[in-house]
């Protein structure tokens, strides 16, 4: 296609949202009109499915739950007055609490005000808040946030060491729907011990974000924590940024949460339009379907050309891959669906993996995120008439052109600036796209059986560890790995037992190996 034809195609397929100043360009996805026409019946069903979901239909049959993250930014859509009222009241409570923390009306026992936050959560309880903090937190926030998003002891130590002199003025958010998820539970216990080590009463620093009646909720109530905010069973982790999960940490950092909600609401309105060409989420879903033949055959590479959007690809990684990565479709057929997502930022990636994107395996499509405003204020000239921002824009446009010239497809999303409204809109845009695409390929976007399988497998390993250690503590002589496995009734778990013991030995847990470490079958094991 020559330059003139491309210009016409660009104009034909350009989507523009005037209120948000957002552009979506899918002209460099090489679908034709016949392809679009062939998908229209599927889109009719997808639009109908989405309308039913927003009305409160059971959209997650595995757990018999509604899916209502859209109600968070427009409570009038909620299926009952009680849900609508709770959404409104929770937002007001979040704003009031944040103001009291920031002004010192609520303050720690040994300081005039809180200066820092430790946010403990995993998955959607971390990725959304991390993305929003990186994108929107002011340079000098009223409280500086730090995340514990894993059960890695060294990672926890790094945060606690960094904050050791500020612990007495550090607020702790514990985010867990059940309170029993191992990663946040472990983080909470370790942080509690750190506070006790400085003779600080953890309850006077702690805030719970959890389901009403959960184990965490009961602990918070019994110990008298500073506050508790709800997590709803109709909001999944990966779509929870507009709930207490995301709004509490954002508000505490001084981010305009109402503007973020308003941006999401505007995008929700735009993505309800039942016409593919006039619905940005439908255009994205169309492009994803085209690129991967409706089977996820190509990866999505996300390149935001703005440092503050660095974590957008990680956020989308969970949203897209956890929603769409499914073995079975809604009819129970094995389909192995999903779209792999990765990325970092432009133009950094042009000096990393863009070489492969341009000339290597064509197993991807690119999503370029463009921000029109370079910075707040004027930019100095680097060359005559040229600024650093001009270079960044040139690199984006150049990458887009270079990819297309070599038959590599791309999508470009353009926003006027990075602010609370546009970030809210981006989140809402991709939430809706995932839902529409899932309908196109006939899968449930709102459950995650693979995650649950991983949790159960981890529990089996920890149970195995307890049995192994218990056996070795009773035995008076060293045993081979095979003997250990036989004695605890786990003859098929020799490799797992070896790896458990190797980890314990490396962490001075009393495990002693005799034999050749390079030949595990030669080892004799005891506990000192």
UniProtKB/Swiss-Prot annotation:
EC top class, as a word: isomerase
Known pathway: Carbohydrate biosynthesis; gluconeogenesis; Carbohydrate degradation; glycolysis; D-glyceraldehyde 3-phosphate and glycerone phosphate from D-glucose: step 2/4
GO biological process, one term: glycolytic process
GO cellular component: cytosol
Lineage top rank: taxon: Bacteria
Family matches, as InterPro entries: G6P_Isomerase (IPR001672), Phosphoglucose_isomerase_CS (IPR018189), SIS_dom_sf (IPR046348), SIS_PGI_1 (IPR035476), SIS_PGI_2 (IPR035482)
Principal subcellular localisation of the protein: cytoplasm
Record keyword Disulfide bond present: no
Reaction(s) the record says it catalyses: alpha-D-glucose 6-phosphate = beta-D-fructose 6-phosphate
This protein's UniProt keywords: Cytoplasm, Gluconeogenesis, Glycolysis, Isomerase
Gene Ontology MF term list: carbohydrate derivative binding; glucose-6-phosphate isomerase activity; monosaccharide binding
Catalytic residue positions: 322 (proton donor), 351, 455
Coiled-coil blocks: none
Subcellular location(s) per record: Cytoplasm
Gene3D superfamilies hit by this protein: Glucose-6-phosphate isomerase like protein, domain 1 (3.40.50.10490)
EC number: 5.3.1.9
The keyword Cell division is annotated on this UniProt entry: no
Family: Belongs to the GPI family.
NCBIfam families assigned to the protein according to its UniProt record, in alphabetical order: PRK14096.1 (NF010696)
Function: Catalyzes the reversible isomerization of glucose-6-phosphate to fructose-6-phosphate.
Protein name: Glucose-6-phosphate isomerase
Gene that encodes the chain: pgi
């Amino acid at each position: 296609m020559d330059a003139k034809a491309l210009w016409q195609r660009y104009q034909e397929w350009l989507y523009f949202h005037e209120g948000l100043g957002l552009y979506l360009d899918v002209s460099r996805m090489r679908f034709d009109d016949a392809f679009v026409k062939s998908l229209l019946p599927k889109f009719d069903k997808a639009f109908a499915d989405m309308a039913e979901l927003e009305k409160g239909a059971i959209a997650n049959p595995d757990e018999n739950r509604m899916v209502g993250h859209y109600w968070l930014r427009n409570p009038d859509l909620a299926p009952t007055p009680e849900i609508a009222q709770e959404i409104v009241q929770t937002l007001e409570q979040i704003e009031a609490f944040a103001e009291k923390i920031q002004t010192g009306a609520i303050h720690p026992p040994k300081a005039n005000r809180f200066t820092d936050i430790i946010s403990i959560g995993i998955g959607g309880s971390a990725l959304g808040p991390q993305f929003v903090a990186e994108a929107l937190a002011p340079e000098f926030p009223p409280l500086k946030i730090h995340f514990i998003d894993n059960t890695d002891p060294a990672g926890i130590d790094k945060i606690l060491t960094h904050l050791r002199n500020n612990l007495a003025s550090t607020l702790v958010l514990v985010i867990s729907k059940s309170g029993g998820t191992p990663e946040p539970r472990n983080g909470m216990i370790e942080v509690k011990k750190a506070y006790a080590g400085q003779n600080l009463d953890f309850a006077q620093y702690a805030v719970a974000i959890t389901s009403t009646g959960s184990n965490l909720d009961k602990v918070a109530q019994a110990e008298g924590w500073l506050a508790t905010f709800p997590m709803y069973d109709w909001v999944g982790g990966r779509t929870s940024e507009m709930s207490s999960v995301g709004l509490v940490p954002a508000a505490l950092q001084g981010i305009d949460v109402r503007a973020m909600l308003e941006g999401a609401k505007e995008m929700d309105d735009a993505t309800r339009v039942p016409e593919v060409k006039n619905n940005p989420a439908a255009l994205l879903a169309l492009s994803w379907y085209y690129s991967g033949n409706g089977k996820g055959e190509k990866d999505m590479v996300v390149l935001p050309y703005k440092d503050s959007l660095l974590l957008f690809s990680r956020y989308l990684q969970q949203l897209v891959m956890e929603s769409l990565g499914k073995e079975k479709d809604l009819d129970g057929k094995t389909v192995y669906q999903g779209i792999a997502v990765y990325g970092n930022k432009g133009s950094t990636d042009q000096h990393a993996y863009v070489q492969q994107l341009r000339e290597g395996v064509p197993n991807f499509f690119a999503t370029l995120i463009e921000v029109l405003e370079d910075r707040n204020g004027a930019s100095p000239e680097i060359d005559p008439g040229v600024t650093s921002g001009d270079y960044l824009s040139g690199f984006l446009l150049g990458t887009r052109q270079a990819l297309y010239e070599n038959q590599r497809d791309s999508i470009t999303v353009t926003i006027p600036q990075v602010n609370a409204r546009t970030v809210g809109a981006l989140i809402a845009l991709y939430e809706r796209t995932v839902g529409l695409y899932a309908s196109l390929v006939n899968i449930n976007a709102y459950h995650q059986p693979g995650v649950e399988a991983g949790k159960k497998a981890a529990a089996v390993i920890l149970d195995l560890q307890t049995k192994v250690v218990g056996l070795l503590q009773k035995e008076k002589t060293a045993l081979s790995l095979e003997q250990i496995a036989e004695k605890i009734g786990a003859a098929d778990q020799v490799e797992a037992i070896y790896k458990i013991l190797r980890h314990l030995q490396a962490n001075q847990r009393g495990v002693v190996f005799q034999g050749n470490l390079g030949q595990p079958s030669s080892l004799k094991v005891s506990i000192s």
